[in-house]
C-alpha cells in the first residue's frame, strides 16, 4: 500500500453511494489511501441491498458485460476475454520477508508448493500497476463476512474493486453490505484491493466487453499485513478475494497463528435410517466431485445427505474437544460442465434463479448449456458457445469452457443443512481425502492413526483438472487438495496438523481416503459413483460408531467382505476395486517419498518420515 496519508484527504473521486463519515476509521483510511493511489472517478460504498444489486446488474447489462437469461428468474451470463478464464498459479504469489516462511526450500528446481515474492519485488510490481489504474471507473467498497455474521469462527474483509461483476458475485458468495460494517466497528479486517487494470479511456478495445489485463496480472497475498492485492484479472478465483485468496491462503496462515484449520473441504451432514446424524469434511482437488458429493442424493433407502458447504471448511476444536466446522462462504462457485440432473440434481435445482453463469454456452431460447448437461434441446433451438459463436457438436471443440462456472446462493440448495449457518459450527467426526486415480488406489481405506492420516493427506495425488491452467492427463501431487492454496510453508502446515493430536480433550476425527475413479483394463470405471457413493459413506458412518467390519492392509483398513452394502447394485468387481498391488504401491511410496523429500526437504516433520518408512516396511512384507 502507498505511504500512510493524512486523514481527511481531499479526494478527487466523488462518493456516489454511502458516506465516508459512516465508515469505521480504519476502513476509511484504507479506502482513502487506495483511492489516492488508484484515482477512481467515483466511490460507491456497497450496502448489499436488493435495490443496489438490481441496479448494478442492469448497468452491466447495458454495458454488455452481462446478458439476461430469459428462461430463468434473475439469471445472467458473462462471457470473459478468452485470456481470463481460470486461476493462474504462476501469477499468484505470497509476499513475506523470508522465502522459507512461504515455501520450503526444495532440493532441486522450483517449489511446487507456492510462489514467493520478495517485499522489494512486490513494491516494484505494485508501483508499476496500481497508480491511476481506476481512472474513469467507480471504486466499489465491499464490506464482507467470511462465515455467518457474528460467529466466533468468522472473519471480516473489505474489498475495494473497480468491477461491478465482482460486487454482484461477492453478494452471492459472502455475507455482504451494511450489516457487516456495523458488526465490524473498530475490529480487525483483511484488506483486499482488486483492479481489472483497465483505466478509461481504454488503450485497446475490450474482448467480449470484459476488462482485464492479462500481461500484468498479479495476485499477491501479504499475510503479515493481512492484505490481498489483485490486478489484471476479473475471473472469480482471482477477483472474488474472499474465496481462495482469503478463505484459504490468508486464513490458513491466520489458522496456524490462532490454532485452527482452514481447508479446501466440503462439509456434509449424513443421517442414517434410525435418524442418527454425523458431519464429515472432505478434501478433493478442484473438479474431482466435491460439489457432487456435498449435494448427493443417496441411492441407499432411508439415508439422507445435507450440504453445509461444497468447497471450504474452517475448523476449530471447542472446549469439549469436538472439531467444529463452518462454511465461510455464502454461495457455490461450481464448475458447470458435467453438472446434470443425473450427476447433481440438487445443483441443477439450486441454479434456476439468482445465478451468475460465466463462460457457459447459451441457447437461443435464453437458457444455458454445457458439456454433460444431458438435456435434449427443443427443436429449432440453437447454441451460442462461450466464444460467442454459433455452435454445433460437429465443431470439435466444447460449447462451454471446461472451467465455466455458476455462482449461486447456498440458501437456494434444496438440501442445505439446517445448521449450515450455525455460529458455533457443526461437529466433524470424519475427514475424507481423495483424488482422481485411474489405477492402483482402492475405493476406500481408513487411516491407521491421526499421524498416518496426516501422511495420507500429504500423499494425495490426482489427475490434473481444468480449474487451473494445466493441460493434459498427468497425475499431480496435490497434498490436502491445498497445493495451489497454501498460505505458508507446507512443512509447517504438516506440523500444525500433527499438533492437533496434542489438543487437550481432542476427539480426533477418523481419516479416510476415497477414489471413485478407478478403471478396469478397458478403461471403464469400476464404481458407478454419484448417489452410490452413499454406500461408502455408510461404511465410514458405521466405522466411526465402531460397528462396521474392516480388514487391515499395508495401506490402511478396507471394508471386510460384506461390510460394504452392495444391495441393488449390478455386478461390481469388488476384488479389482479393492486390490492392492505390491508393485504399484512400491512405486507409489517411492514417488511420494521423492516428492516430499524434494519439495518439503528440511521442513518435513519427522513424524511424516516415520510414516513413509513404516509404509515401505508394510508393503515389503506383502
From Swiss-Prot:
<comment type="subunit">
    <text>Monomer.</text>
</comment>
<keyword id="KW-0963">Cytoplasm</keyword>
<dbReference type="GO" id="GO:0018105">
    <property type="term" value="P:peptidyl-serine phosphorylation"/>
</dbReference>
<keyword id="KW-0418">Kinase</keyword>
<feature type="modified residue" description="N6-acetyllysine; by p300/EP300">
    <location>
        <position position="71"/>
    </location>
</feature>
<feature type="modified residue" description="N6-acetyllysine">
    <location>
        <position position="473"/>
    </location>
</feature>
<dbReference type="InterPro" id="IPR018091">
    <property type="entry name" value="PEP_carboxykin_GTP_CS"/>
</dbReference>
<dbReference type="GO" id="GO:0030145">
    <property type="term" value="F:manganese ion binding"/>
</dbReference>
<keyword id="KW-0832">Ubl conjugation</keyword>
<dbReference type="GO" id="GO:0006094">
    <property type="term" value="P:gluconeogenesis"/>
</dbReference>
<feature type="modified residue" description="N6-acetyllysine">
    <location>
        <position position="91"/>
    </location>
</feature>
<feature type="binding site">
    <location>
        <begin position="235"/>
        <end position="237"/>
    </location>
    <ligand>
        <name>substrate</name>
    </ligand>
</feature>
<dbReference type="GO" id="GO:0004613">
    <property type="term" value="F:phosphoenolpyruvate carboxykinase (GTP) activity"/>
</dbReference>
<feature type="modified residue" description="Phosphoserine">
    <location>
        <position position="118"/>
    </location>
</feature>
<feature type="modified residue" description="N6-acetyllysine">
    <location>
        <position position="524"/>
    </location>
</feature>
<comment type="similarity">
    <text>Belongs to the phosphoenolpyruvate carboxykinase [GTP] family.</text>
</comment>
<keyword id="KW-0210">Decarboxylase</keyword>
<protein>
    <recommendedName>
        <fullName>Phosphoenolpyruvate carboxykinase, cytosolic [GTP]</fullName>
        <ecNumber>4.1.1.32</ecNumber>
        <ecNumber>2.7.11.-</ecNumber>
    </recommendedName>
</protein>
<dbReference type="GO" id="GO:0019543">
    <property type="term" value="P:propionate catabolic process"/>
</dbReference>
<feature type="modified residue" description="N6-acetyllysine; by p300/EP300">
    <location>
        <position position="70"/>
    </location>
</feature>
<feature type="modified residue" description="N6-acetyllysine; by p300/EP300">
    <location>
        <position position="594"/>
    </location>
</feature>
<dbReference type="GO" id="GO:0046327">
    <property type="term" value="P:glycerol biosynthetic process from pyruvate"/>
</dbReference>
<feature type="binding site">
    <location>
        <position position="264"/>
    </location>
    <ligand>
        <name>Mn(2+)</name>
    </ligand>
</feature>
<feature type="binding site">
    <location>
        <position position="405"/>
    </location>
    <ligand>
        <name>GTP</name>
    </ligand>
</feature>
<keyword id="KW-0456">Lyase</keyword>
<keyword id="KW-0808">Transferase</keyword>
<dbReference type="Pfam" id="PF00821">
    <property type="entry name" value="PEPCK_GTP"/>
</dbReference>
<dbReference type="GO" id="GO:0106264">
    <property type="term" value="F:protein serine kinase activity (using GTP as donor)"/>
</dbReference>
<feature type="modified residue" description="Phosphothreonine">
    <location>
        <position position="178"/>
    </location>
</feature>
<dbReference type="InterPro" id="IPR035078">
    <property type="entry name" value="PEP_carboxykinase_GTP_N"/>
</dbReference>
<dbReference type="GO" id="GO:0071333">
    <property type="term" value="P:cellular response to glucose stimulus"/>
</dbReference>
<feature type="region of interest" description="Omega-loop">
    <location>
        <begin position="457"/>
        <end position="487"/>
    </location>
</feature>
<feature type="binding site">
    <location>
        <begin position="403"/>
        <end position="405"/>
    </location>
    <ligand>
        <name>substrate</name>
    </ligand>
</feature>
<dbReference type="GO" id="GO:0046890">
    <property type="term" value="P:regulation of lipid biosynthetic process"/>
</dbReference>
<keyword id="KW-0342">GTP-binding</keyword>
<keyword id="KW-0597">Phosphoprotein</keyword>
<feature type="modified residue" description="N6-acetyllysine">
    <location>
        <position position="521"/>
    </location>
</feature>
<dbReference type="InterPro" id="IPR035077">
    <property type="entry name" value="PEP_carboxykinase_GTP_C"/>
</dbReference>
<dbReference type="GO" id="GO:0005829">
    <property type="term" value="C:cytosol"/>
</dbReference>
<feature type="active site">
    <location>
        <position position="288"/>
    </location>
</feature>
<keyword id="KW-0547">Nucleotide-binding</keyword>
<feature type="binding site">
    <location>
        <position position="311"/>
    </location>
    <ligand>
        <name>Mn(2+)</name>
    </ligand>
</feature>
Amino acid at each position: 500500500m502507498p505511504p500512510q496519508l493524512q486523514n481527511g484527504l481531499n479526494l478527487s473521486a466523488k462518493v456516489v453511494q454511502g458516506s465516508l463519515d459512516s465508515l469505521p476509521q480504519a476502513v476509511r483510511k484504507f479506502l482513502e489511501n487506495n483511492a489516492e493511489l488508484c484515482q477512481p472517478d467515483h466511490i460507491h460504498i456497497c450496502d448489499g441491498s436488493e435495490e443496489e444489486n438490481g441496479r448494478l446488474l442492469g448497468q452491466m447489462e447495458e454495458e454488455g458485460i452481462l446478458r439476461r437469461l430469459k428462461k430463468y428468474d434473475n439469471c445472467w451470463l458473462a462471457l470473459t476475454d478468452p485470456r481470463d478464464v481460470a486461476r493462474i498459479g504462476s501469477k499468484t504469489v505470497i509476499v513475506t520477508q523470508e522465502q522459507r516462511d512461504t515455501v520450503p526450500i526444495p532440493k532441486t528446481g522450483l517449489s511446487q508448493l507456492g510462489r514467493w515474492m520478495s517485499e522489494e519485488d512486490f513494491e516494484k510490481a505494485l508501483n508499476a500497476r496500481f497508480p491511476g489504474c481506476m481512472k474513469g471507473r467507480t471504486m466499489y467498497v465491499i464490506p464482507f463476512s467470511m462465515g455467518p455474521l457474528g460467529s466466533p469462527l468468522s472473519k471480516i474483509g473489505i474489498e475495494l474493486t473497480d468491477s461491478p461483476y465482482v460486487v454482484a458475485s461477492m453478494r452471492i458468495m459472502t455475507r455482504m453490505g451494511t450489516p457487516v460494517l456495523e458488526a465490524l466497528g473498530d475490529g480487525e479486517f483483511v484488506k483486499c484491493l482488486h483492479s481489472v487494470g483497465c483505466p478509461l479511456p481504454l488503450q485497446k478495445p475490450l474482448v467480449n466487453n470484459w476488462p482485464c489485463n492479462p500481461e500484468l496480472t498479479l495476485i499477491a497475498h501479504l499475510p503479515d499485513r493481512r492484505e490481498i492485492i489483485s490486478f489484471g484479472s476479473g475471473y472469480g478465483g482471482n477477483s472474488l478475494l474472499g474465496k481462495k485468496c482469503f478463505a484459504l491462503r490468508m486464513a490458513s496462515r491466520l489458522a496456524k497463528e490462532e490454532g485452527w484449520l482452514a481447508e479446501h473441504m466440503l462439509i456434509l451432514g449424513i443421517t442414517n435410517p434410525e435418524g442418527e446424524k454425523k458431519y464429515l469434511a472432505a478434501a478433493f482437488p478442484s473438479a474431482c466431485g466435491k460439489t457432487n458429493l456435498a449435494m448427493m442424493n443417496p441411492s441407499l433407502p432411508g439415508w439422507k445427505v445435507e450440504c453445509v458447504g461444497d468447497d471450504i471448511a474452517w475448523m476449530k476444536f471447542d472446549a469439549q474437544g469436538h472439531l467444529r466446522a463452518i462454511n465461510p462462504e455464502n454461495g457455490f462457485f461450481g464448475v458447470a460442465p458435467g453438472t446434470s440432473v443425473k450427476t447433481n440434481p440438487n445443483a441443477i435445482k439450486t441454479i434456476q434463479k439468482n445465478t451468475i453463469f460465466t463462460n457457459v454456452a447459451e441457447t437461443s431460447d435464453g437458457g444455458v448449456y454445457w458439456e454433460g448437461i444431458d438435456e435434449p434441446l427443443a427443436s429449432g433451438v440453437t447454441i451460442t458457445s462461450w466464444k460467442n459463436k454459433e455452435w454445433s457438436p460437429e465443431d470439435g471443440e466444447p460449447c462451454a469452457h471446461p472451467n465455466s462456472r455458476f455462482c449461486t446462493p447456498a440458501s437456494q440448495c434444496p438440501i442445505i443443512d439446517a445448521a449450515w449457518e450455525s455460529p458455533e459450527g457443526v461437529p466433524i467426526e470424519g475427514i475424507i481425502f481423495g483424488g482422481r486415480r485411474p489405477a492402483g488406489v482402492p475405493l476406500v481405506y481408513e487411516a491407521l492413526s491421526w499421524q498416518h492420516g496426516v501422511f495420507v493427506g500429504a500423499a494425495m495425488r490426482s489427475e490434473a483438472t481444468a480449474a487451473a491452467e494445466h493441460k493434459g492427463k498427468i497425475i499431480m501431487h496435490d497434498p490436502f487438495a491445498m497445493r495451489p492454496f497454501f498460505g505458508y510453508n507446507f512443512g509447517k502446515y504438516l506440523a500444525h496438523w500433527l499438533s492437533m493430536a496434542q489438543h487437550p480433550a481432542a476427539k480426533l476425527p477418523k481419516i479416510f481416503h476415497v477414489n471413485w475413479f478407478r478403471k478396469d483394463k478397458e478403461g471403464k470405471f469400476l464404481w458407478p459413483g454419484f448417489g452410490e457413493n452413499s454406500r461408502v459413506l455408510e461404511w465410514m458412518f458405521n466405522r466411526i460408531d465402531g460397528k462396521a467390519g474392516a480388514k487391515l492392509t499395508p495401506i490402511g483398513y478396507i471394508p471386510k467382505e460384506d461390510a460394504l452394502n452392495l444391495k441393488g447394485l449390478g455386478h461390481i468387481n469388488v476384488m479389482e476395486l479393492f486390490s492392492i498391488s505390491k508393485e504399484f504401491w512400491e512405486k507409489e511410496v517411492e514417488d511420494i517419498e521423492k516428492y516430499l523429500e524434494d519439495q518439503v526437504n528440511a521442513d518435513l516433520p519427522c513424524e511424516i518420515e516415520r510414516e513413509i518408512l513404516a509404509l515401505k516396511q508394510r508393503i515389503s512384507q506383502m
